[in-house]
Curated annotation (Swiss-Prot):
Transmembrane segments: none annotated. SUPFAM superfamilies: Class II aaRS and biotin synthetases, tRNA-binding arm. One of its GO terms (biological process) is selenocysteine biosynthetic process. Belongs to the class-II aminoacyl-tRNA synthetase family. Type-1 seryl-tRNA synthetase subfamily. L-serine binds at T226, S227, E228, E280, T379. The keyword Manganese does not apply. It comes from Corynebacterium diphtheriae (strain ATCC 700971 / NCTC 13129 / Biotype gravis). Consists of two distinct domains, a catalytic core and a N-terminal extension that is involved in tRNA binding. Its EC number is 6.1.1.11. GO terms for cellular component: cytoplasm. This is Serine--tRNA ligase. Homodimer. The tRNA molecule binds across the dimer.
Length: 419
């Protein structure tokens, strides 16, 4: 939810953000008009309440002869107060309705759509193979790590089993991420994967991409596509203590996505699936700390990608490709040899005060005044990392070298083909 104070003081900033996102700038004027009507309705209701209160004092001081007429006037005024309060509530509802149509105000992101990102950095050099590399599914099947056929039999398209060392490889990766998170001051959590509509809406996931979310109609609950949702809802309607610095959580959960808009895309293997596991970082901080925290999350992603030994690049995502809650987002993309391209492994977003304003999460400054907090999120490990790990570390004999950082968890240095 955007800041109405920012809207009033800098409407052109919000208009430009709408243009960068590819959204309608005319919404700015609609919201300004609705906000003005809301403020007028508040003043009108406040004035009538004050008048009614003064009238009550006059009645208490009136003589018995004067009271009947004054009581009649008081009742009439009471009706006017009720009508004014209804108008006030209606005006507020209209403001909220229009406000919910806005994405976050874009900050420093490049203009354009999905293909207009800016590459900020390349790390590592894509490997030159002296043999024809296999894709992750061929490797996963020959090594006994991935079973898509039985996953499809049981759950349908885009489901799979991780088996044997494949399960240990994922658990090792997630455990390594959890350790790194704890070393960097994050509190590990295993949060709910089902959340109420107000939490899903509060995080900005019930907008244009709501068809990507699984909804349990009988229970009025949503399955999360990321633990970001549950971690953002953790402090809903609370005033949190940021006097000792940011509050940092790392959520380990299964995640669920319908992939409704992805028909025909990445149907092979486990790159784009309906269920996967992920360790997600989430930070609450003061708004002025958010940019630095965003870089800190990106640096942790860098460390983790270095640990699993894959070449990658970092991109600055264009405004038109941002989710509604993000003011700016960096993606890290790993090199996938058999696709001859980079594919997204992680993202980290600065959501400024957008989510916390919707979820009413605040903190107090040194004077005791309450302010809306800022929130940020970033992925530290997830199932699709296995795609990059397997393909980049394969050998000519069909084996895969386990990255050194994962060997204590997997218990092997090399994964050998099953005979």
């Amino acid at each position: 939810m955007i800041d109405l104070k920012l809207l009033r003081e800098n409407p052109d900033v919000v208009r430009e953000s709408q243009r960068i996102r590819g959204e309608d700038p005319a919404l700015v004027d609609q919201l300004l008009e609705a906000d003005e009507k809301r403020r007028e309705a508040i003043k009108s209701a406040d004035d009538l309440r004050a008048e009614h209160k003064a009238f009550g004092k006059k009645i208490s001081q009136a003589s018995p002869e004067e009271r009947p007429a004054l009581l009649e006037g008081s009742n009439e005024l009471k009706s006017r107060v009720k009508a004014a309060e209804e108008a006030e509530a209606e005006a507020l509802a209209k403001v909220n309705e229009i406000q919910m149509l806005f994405g976050n105000v874009v900050t420093d992101a490049p203009a354009g759509g999905e293909d207009d990102y800016i590459v900020l950095e390349h790390v590592g050099t894509p490997r030159t193979f002296d043999f024809e590399p296999k894709d992750h599914l061929d490797l996963g099947e020959s090594l006994g790590l991935i079973d898509v056929k039985r996953g499809t039999k049981v759950g349908g398209a885009r489901f799979y089993y991780l088996t044997g060392d494949g399960a240990f490889l994922q658990l090792g990766m997630l455990n390594l991420a959890a350790q790194k998170a704890r070393e960097n001051g994050f509190q590990l959590m295993i949060p709910p994967v089902l959340v109420r509509p107000e939490v899903m809406s509060g995080t900005g996931f019930l907008g244009a991409h709501s068809d990507e979310i699984y909804y349990l109609e009988r229970d009025d609950l949503y399955l999360v596509g990321t633990s970001e949702v549950a971690l953002a809802g953790y402090h809903q309607d609370e005033i949190i203590d940021l006097s000792d610095g940011p509050i940092k959580y790392a959520g380990w959960s299964s995640c669920f996505r319908r992939e409704a808009g992805s028909y025909g895309k990445d149907t092979r293997g486990i790159l784009r699936v309906h269920q996967f596991d992920k360790l997600e970082m989430f930070v609450y901080c003061k708004p002025e700390e958010a940019v630095a925290q965003h870089q800190a999350l990106l640096n942790m992603e860098r460390e983790m990608l270095a640990a699993v030994e894959v070449p990658y690049r970092i991109i600055d995502v264009a405004g038109g490709d941002l989710g509604s809650s993000a003011a700016r987002k960096f993606d890290t993309e790993a090199w996938i040899p058999t696709q001859n391209t980079y594919r997204e492994l992680t993202s980290t977003s600065n959501c400024t005060t957008f989510q916390a304003r919707r979820l009413r999460t605040r903190y107090r400054d040194e004077s005791g005044k309450a302010h809306t907090a800022a929130t940020l999120n970033g992925t530290l490990a997830t199932t699709r990392w296995l795609v990059a790990i397997l393909e980049n570390n394969q050998q000519a004999d069909g084996s895969v070298i386990v990255p050194e950082a994962l060997r204590p968890f997997v218990g092997k240095e090399v994964l050998e083909p099953k005979k």
